[in-house]
Amino acid sequence: MKTAQEMRVNSVALIDGQPWLIQKAEFTKSGRNSAIVKMKLKNLLNGSKTETVYKADDKMEPVILERKEVNLSYISGEDYVFMDPEYNSYELRAEDLESVLPFIEEGMTDVCEAVFFEGKVISVDLPTTIVRQVVYTENAARGDTSGKVMKPAKLRNGTEIKVAEFVDIDDWIEIDTRDGSYKGRTQAPA
Protein backbone atom coordinates (compact mmCIF):
# COMPACT_ATOMS: atom_id res chain seq x y z
CA MET A 1 0.00 0.00 0.00
CA LYS A 2 1.13 3.52 -0.78
CA THR A 3 -0.15 6.85 0.47
CA ALA A 4 -2.02 9.14 -1.93
CA GLN A 5 0.96 11.50 -1.77
CA GLU A 6 3.29 8.75 -3.05
CA MET A 7 1.13 7.87 -6.09
CA ARG A 8 2.42 9.42 -9.31
CA VAL A 9 0.87 10.51 -12.61
CA ASN A 10 0.36 7.58 -15.05
CA SER A 11 0.36 5.04 -12.24
CA VAL A 12 -2.69 2.84 -11.64
CA ALA A 13 -4.48 2.44 -8.30
CA LEU A 14 -7.16 -0.05 -7.26
CA ILE A 15 -10.13 1.97 -5.98
CA ASP A 16 -13.38 0.17 -5.05
CA GLY A 17 -12.12 -2.96 -6.82
CA GLN A 18 -11.51 -1.21 -10.16
CA PRO A 19 -8.28 0.03 -11.77
CA TRP A 20 -8.03 3.83 -12.08
CA LEU A 21 -5.30 5.62 -14.05
CA ILE A 22 -4.02 8.75 -12.30
CA GLN A 23 -3.96 11.40 -15.03
CA LYS A 24 -3.19 14.36 -12.77
CA ALA A 25 -2.13 14.64 -9.12
CA GLU A 26 -1.77 17.97 -7.36
CA PHE A 27 -0.39 18.08 -3.80
CA THR A 28 -1.60 20.96 -1.57
CA LYS A 29 -0.61 21.74 2.01
CA SER A 30 -2.33 24.47 3.96
CA GLY A 31 -1.26 25.84 7.34
CA ARG A 32 -4.33 24.81 9.33
CA ASN A 33 -5.55 21.67 7.63
CA SER A 34 -3.82 18.44 6.71
CA ALA A 35 -2.22 18.06 3.29
CA ILE A 36 -4.45 16.91 0.42
CA VAL A 37 -3.95 15.47 -3.05
CA LYS A 38 -6.37 16.44 -5.83
CA MET A 39 -6.49 13.68 -8.46
CA LYS A 40 -7.95 13.40 -11.92
CA LEU A 41 -8.71 9.71 -12.50
CA LYS A 42 -9.78 7.56 -15.46
CA ASN A 43 -11.45 4.17 -14.97
CA LEU A 44 -9.60 1.65 -17.15
CA LEU A 45 -12.60 -0.71 -17.36
CA ASN A 46 -15.35 1.66 -18.51
CA GLY A 47 -13.47 4.86 -19.47
CA SER A 48 -15.31 7.14 -17.03
CA LYS A 49 -13.39 10.08 -15.58
CA THR A 50 -13.63 11.76 -12.19
CA GLU A 51 -11.84 14.27 -10.00
CA THR A 52 -11.37 13.36 -6.34
CA VAL A 53 -9.63 14.79 -3.28
CA TYR A 54 -7.70 12.49 -0.92
CA LYS A 55 -5.87 13.20 2.32
CA ALA A 56 -2.13 12.89 1.69
CA ASP A 57 -1.88 9.94 4.09
CA ASP A 58 -4.88 7.98 2.67
CA LYS A 59 -3.79 4.48 1.65
CA MET A 60 -4.07 3.37 -1.99
CA GLU A 61 -3.27 0.02 -3.55
CA PRO A 62 -1.03 0.34 -6.62
CA VAL A 63 -1.82 -1.98 -9.54
CA ILE A 64 0.72 -3.39 -11.94
CA LEU A 65 -0.95 -4.13 -15.25
CA GLU A 66 0.30 -6.97 -17.43
CA ARG A 67 1.22 -6.01 -21.00
CA LYS A 68 1.73 -8.20 -24.05
CA GLU A 69 2.71 -7.43 -27.67
CA VAL A 70 -0.13 -7.97 -30.14
CA ASN A 71 -1.00 -7.20 -33.77
CA LEU A 72 -4.39 -6.42 -35.28
CA SER A 73 -5.67 -9.63 -36.85
CA TYR A 74 -9.00 -8.49 -38.28
CA ILE A 75 -12.02 -6.22 -37.79
CA SER A 76 -15.54 -7.65 -37.72
CA GLY A 77 -18.16 -4.92 -37.39
CA GLU A 78 -17.67 -3.35 -33.94
CA ASP A 79 -15.25 -6.10 -32.84
CA TYR A 80 -11.47 -5.76 -33.17
CA VAL A 81 -9.45 -8.96 -32.87
CA PHE A 82 -5.77 -8.80 -31.88
CA MET A 83 -3.33 -11.72 -31.86
CA ASP A 84 -0.14 -12.27 -29.86
CA PRO A 85 2.97 -14.13 -31.14
CA GLU A 86 1.66 -17.40 -29.57
CA TYR A 87 -1.51 -17.09 -31.72
CA ASN A 88 -3.81 -16.29 -28.77
CA SER A 89 -6.55 -13.93 -29.93
CA TYR A 90 -8.10 -11.10 -27.90
CA GLU A 91 -11.39 -9.49 -28.92
CA LEU A 92 -12.24 -5.92 -27.97
CA ARG A 93 -15.30 -3.80 -28.73
CA ALA A 94 -14.95 -0.37 -30.36
CA GLU A 95 -15.85 1.38 -27.07
CA ASP A 96 -12.88 -0.36 -25.36
CA LEU A 97 -10.54 1.22 -27.94
CA GLU A 98 -12.03 4.71 -27.88
CA SER A 99 -8.75 6.61 -27.49
CA VAL A 100 -6.85 4.72 -30.23
CA LEU A 101 -9.75 3.94 -32.59
CA PRO A 102 -9.02 6.85 -34.99
CA PHE A 103 -5.64 5.28 -35.81
CA ILE A 104 -6.67 1.63 -36.20
CA GLU A 105 -7.19 0.43 -39.76
CA GLU A 106 -7.57 -2.93 -41.47
CA GLY A 107 -4.21 -4.37 -42.51
CA MET A 108 -2.07 -2.22 -40.20
CA THR A 109 1.25 -3.78 -39.20
CA ASP A 110 1.99 -1.71 -36.08
CA VAL A 111 3.01 -3.74 -33.03
CA CYS A 112 0.60 -2.79 -30.23
CA GLU A 113 0.47 -3.61 -26.52
CA ALA A 114 -2.55 -5.33 -24.99
CA VAL A 115 -3.18 -4.20 -21.41
CA PHE A 116 -4.48 -6.87 -18.99
CA PHE A 117 -6.21 -6.51 -15.61
CA GLU A 118 -6.82 -9.73 -13.66
CA GLY A 119 -6.15 -11.82 -16.79
CA LYS A 120 -8.68 -9.92 -18.95
CA VAL A 121 -7.61 -7.60 -21.76
CA ILE A 122 -9.02 -4.12 -21.08
CA SER A 123 -7.39 -2.00 -23.79
CA VAL A 124 -4.72 -1.78 -26.46
CA ASP A 125 -1.97 0.84 -26.64
CA LEU A 126 -0.53 1.88 -30.01
CA PRO A 127 3.10 2.89 -30.54
CA THR A 128 3.78 6.58 -29.85
CA THR A 129 4.36 7.26 -33.56
CA ILE A 130 2.55 5.55 -36.43
CA VAL A 131 2.70 5.91 -40.22
CA ARG A 132 -0.50 6.30 -42.25
CA GLN A 133 -1.38 7.17 -45.86
CA VAL A 134 -3.31 10.29 -46.88
CA VAL A 135 -6.17 9.39 -49.24
CA TYR A 136 -7.69 12.85 -49.66
CA THR A 137 -6.65 16.45 -49.10
CA GLU A 138 -7.37 19.80 -50.71
CA ASN A 139 -4.96 22.52 -51.76
CA ALA A 140 -3.98 24.90 -48.97
CA ALA A 141 -5.39 28.43 -49.04
CA ARG A 142 -2.73 30.79 -50.38
CA GLY A 143 -2.11 34.17 -48.81
CA ASP A 144 -2.17 33.42 -45.09
CA THR A 145 1.39 32.10 -44.86
CA SER A 146 2.75 34.07 -41.91
CA GLY A 147 2.82 30.95 -39.72
CA LYS A 148 2.61 27.22 -40.08
CA VAL A 149 -0.18 26.61 -42.62
CA MET A 150 -2.18 23.44 -41.95
CA LYS A 151 -4.96 21.87 -43.99
CA PRO A 152 -7.35 18.95 -43.38
CA ALA A 153 -6.48 15.51 -44.76
CA LYS A 154 -8.34 12.21 -44.65
CA LEU A 155 -6.66 8.90 -43.81
CA ARG A 156 -7.59 5.47 -45.21
CA ASN A 157 -9.90 4.68 -42.26
CA GLY A 158 -11.77 8.00 -42.58
CA THR A 159 -10.02 9.86 -39.77
CA GLU A 160 -9.38 13.54 -40.47
CA ILE A 161 -6.15 15.18 -39.33
CA LYS A 162 -4.49 18.57 -39.90
CA VAL A 163 -1.33 18.28 -42.03
CA ALA A 164 1.23 20.69 -43.51
CA GLU A 165 0.26 22.50 -46.71
CA PHE A 166 2.76 20.54 -48.87
CA VAL A 167 1.25 17.10 -48.09
CA ASP A 168 -0.51 15.55 -51.11
CA ILE A 169 -2.80 12.59 -51.76
CA ASP A 170 -0.96 9.22 -51.43
CA ASP A 171 1.77 10.74 -49.21
CA TRP A 172 2.73 8.82 -46.06
CA ILE A 173 2.77 10.80 -42.82
CA GLU A 174 3.86 10.23 -39.22
CA ILE A 175 1.24 10.79 -36.51
CA ASP A 176 1.73 11.15 -32.75
CA THR A 177 -0.92 8.84 -31.21
CA ARG A 178 -0.89 10.65 -27.84
CA ASP A 179 -2.53 13.78 -29.23
CA GLY A 180 -3.32 12.89 -32.86
CA SER A 181 -0.97 15.51 -34.27
CA TYR A 182 0.88 15.45 -37.59
CA LYS A 183 4.66 15.02 -37.15
CA GLY A 184 5.94 15.00 -40.73
CA ARG A 185 6.15 13.22 -44.07
CA THR A 186 7.88 9.88 -44.29
CA GLN A 187 8.42 6.84 -46.52
CA ALA A 188 5.89 4.03 -46.88
CA PRO A 189 6.39 1.31 -44.26
CA ALA A 190 8.39 -1.68 -45.49
UniProtKB/Swiss-Prot annotation:
GO terms for biological process: peptide biosynthetic process. Its main location: cytoplasm. Gene3D superfamilies: 2.30.30.30, Nucleic acid-binding proteins (2.40.50.140). It comes from the Bacteria. InterPro entries: Elong-fact-P_C, NA-bd_OB-fold, Rib_uL2_dom2, Transl_elong_fac_P/YeiP, Transl_elong_KOW-like, Transl_elong_P/YeiP_cen, Transl_elongation_fac_P, Translation_prot_SH3-like_sf. HAMAP family: EF_P (MF_00141). Involved in peptide bond synthesis. Stimulates efficient translation and peptide-bond synthesis on native or reconstituted 70S ribosomes in vitro. Probably functions indirectly by altering the affinity of the ribosome for aminoacyl-tRNA, thus increasing their reactivity as acceptors for peptidyl transferase. This is Elongation factor P. It comes from Ectopseudomonas mendocina (strain ymp). The lineage of its organism: Bacteria, Pseudomonadati, Pseudomonadota, Gammaproteobacteria, Pseudomonadales.
